[in-house]
Every structure is written in structure tokens, then in C-alpha cells.
Amino acid sequence: MEKRVRLYAFDYNEVRTYLWAALFVVCNMALPQVAHLVPQGGIIFAPLSLVILVGACKLGWKTALLAAVFSPLVNNIIFGMPAWDVLPIMAVKLAVLAIAAGLAVQRMQDVTLWLLCSVVLISEMLGGLAATIADFTIGWPGLLLQVVGGYLIVNRIWKW
């Protein structure tokens, strides 16, 4: 079976793991600024999740996990968002997204819409029932962006 996309799994002893994680953190500093041009844009679009999802699918869970932990922290230090009370919850949800997506892609050796739907649902359900309902009610555009946008980026745009 021919793979449609090249997938990588960088390890913590490789410099490129940290370079890519740093690039994802920078992307996760810029993307929320764009999302916040729309009122409630951070809640609606969940911009940090898209970068973590794409990173986990393309470069493995370890690279994405570094970005998942440091992105909210760096954003809080520089921009004051997310707020301190939300930061740990967001970091855990992003970390679960990074690990779930990275391990699922590593196991399946492919990135499909069903796989992305599954890992996004898993990470969303961590916040409890009320938070999950709120995420789906308010943030459905962001969830759709994660699944469809992540699929297109990994399978169509980022080919190498």
C-alpha cells in the first residue's frame, strides 16, 4: 500500500524536535492574534489546537507535546491569554490532542478524516460534559477547521 503523505516521528534526542516545536509555538503565538480579530475568535476557532493537531500528525506526538505544553504558557507570558485559571486545562487538552493524534497516526500510518474526528472528539471530551457541550455549541467552526483544515494541510499542502 502506497502512503499518500510522509509522516515522521522525531525523538527528544534530536535537535529538529525542538526546532519544530519552537516553530509551532511561534505559529501558536501568531494564529490566536488573527483569530482574536473576530469577537470571541479564540473560543470559536480554537487556534492553538489546529497547529498542535497538524504537528502531531506530521511530526509525531513528542514534537507536538512540547508545543502543546509551551504554547499556552508563552502566550500567557507575552499576551496575557489564556488566563492563568484556564491555562492548565488548555495545556492538558492540547497535550492529550498531541498524544492521541500522534499515536493514532503512528499506528495507522495515515491521516484520514475519521482519524482526525476521533482524536478531536477525544480531546474535547476531557473538559467534562458542560465544557464539551459549550465547545460544540460555540466552537463548532474551530472543530471543523481542525478536522478539515488539519486533513488538508497534512495530506494536500505539507507534502514532504
Language model features with spans:
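Hydrophobic transmembrane alpha-helices
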Residues: 2-58, 62-63
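Generic, low-specificity signal for short hydrophobic/alpha-helical stretches with a mild N-terminal bias
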Residues: 4-9, 16, 20, 33, ...
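Short, structured secondary-structure boundary patches
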Residues: 12-13, 56, 70, 85-90
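Detector for Asparagine
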Residues: 13, 28, 75-76, 155
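Helical-face signature of the major facilitator-like transporter fold
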Residues: 25, 68, 72-76, 94
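Alpha-helical transmembrane segments of multipass membrane proteins
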Residues: 29-33, 53-54, 73-77, 99-103, ...
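Membrane-embedded alpha-helical hairpins and interfacial helices in multi-pass inner-membrane proteins
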Residues: 37-42, 65, 80-96, 103-160
